[in-house]
Every structure is written in structure tokens, then in C-alpha cells.
């Protein structure tokens, strides 16, 4: 996130000094060291294209712009010793205020911006992990990919990452910089949420799969009974309208959901208000 609002905040933004991209991918390779796609054997972790990386960082607050670049794998991000960090932005931009966390679940294609306070950790290491052992069943990366043990994915159980905790990147903490950010802001931006009482209607969206019922974990997956097609417009809406989308997952595995070019606000999950 870089815009006029972000530029007024006291945040780390010196690229490569206190502001770092972290692109996370799990990959499989063939005998020629070429990527293998459409496989559950994605047991090699790459961070910014590097295996087992070490990132030199200053002993102050740093900013990590994290992207889950994996095809299927969900990461349950945290640091050793449950070191606290703060989420300040998501796919939708800056949050209204930092959120203190020890875990952050990140789905494929999802982004998050994090602040990590490394003050007082000079000459120490801090490792970022994915705590896969804590993922509930029904999420790709958990011990069991389907809810209630339904379905299977060829080669999934043999993957050494599934249901396990594993290191993503090591932060090697060095000297503080001359113009260090040393405090976490209490507020970020003012977010005006749309009024659901002024919506033009409710749109029903059902995620399902073809064949084998809910036990089919490999797809093809459907939205309202249809597979994706570049030649078809599934929905149309008036510019500037506010709609309520009611999304139901009728498969045995979790699916990330986002909309390109638009933002949305979650009102409730499973009838629990958010």
C-alpha cells in the first residue's frame, strides 16, 4: 500500500532497509530442476525464490509485505516463541488500526502487511514459521485436506509439509538504523463501511464441485453450478450499487474468495456477526 493516506503515517517504507517483500511459495521440482505443476508433492519452500533464506534486518520496527504465492497451500504464519506482530493492511488496503496477532492464516493469492518490532533483539535471530499443525482439517496444508475426513488428494498424505510446523524465513537482527521507526501507530485510516440496509438486494453464490459429491477435493469446482469461462458473464450489477453476497461452500475443502478490482466487507460468518 502506497498512497496519499499511507504517506502521512509513521511507517517503515525504506525498501530493503526496514520494508521487505516476502513472497511465499511451496514448489515441486523434477529431475531437471524444473517446476512441476498440478501435484500435491509441493514440499520445497521458496521465499522470494530462495530456499532457506536469511534476511538481515535492523533492531527496530520493520514492515513485511507478505504474499502467499502458492497454488493451493494455506499458511498459518507466526514467529518462534509466539513473538507478537501487527497486521496493518490486507488485499483491501490499510486497516483502520493495527491488529496484534501471533498467528495469521494466509490463503493462496492473499496479501498482508505486517509490522514486527525487533527492538532489543540485536545480534539475535527470529524465525517466521507456518504452524501447519494448528490448521483445522478441511484446509489445504492441514493434516487432512477434507472436513470430517471426506475425500482425498493423490500424494497429499506423503507431503512432509502437511499438518506440520516449518520455517519460512530467518530474520537476522543487526544494528538499528539512524531514522528508525520505534512505535506502532494506534490508528491508520478511517474506513467507511457500506450500509447493508441500503443494499439493492442479496446475491446467492454457491461453491460446489462436479462429480463424487463433497468428497471431490480436486475439482473442477463450480460457482452456481458453472465452471469458469472467459466467454461468459456470470453476474452484472449497476455501477455504484451496494449488494449483499451470501456465499456458501458446499465442498469438503476451504476456498479463498476475493473479487478483482473491488473491496468488500464481511458482515457475518455462519450467522455470527462480524
Regions found by a protein language model. Name each.
Residues 1-115, 134-136, 145-214:
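Histidine-centered copper-binding motifs that mark active-site loops
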Residues 64, 114, 128, 245-247, ...:
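A generic structural signal for residues embedded in beta-strands
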Residues 73-80, 127-128, 254-259:
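Short, hydrophobic/aromatic beta-strand segments
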Residues 86-102, 148-150, 163, 198-274:
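Active-site pocket scaffolds in enzymes
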Residues 119-135:
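Short, surface-exposed ligand- or partner-binding patches at beta-edge/loop junctions that are enriched
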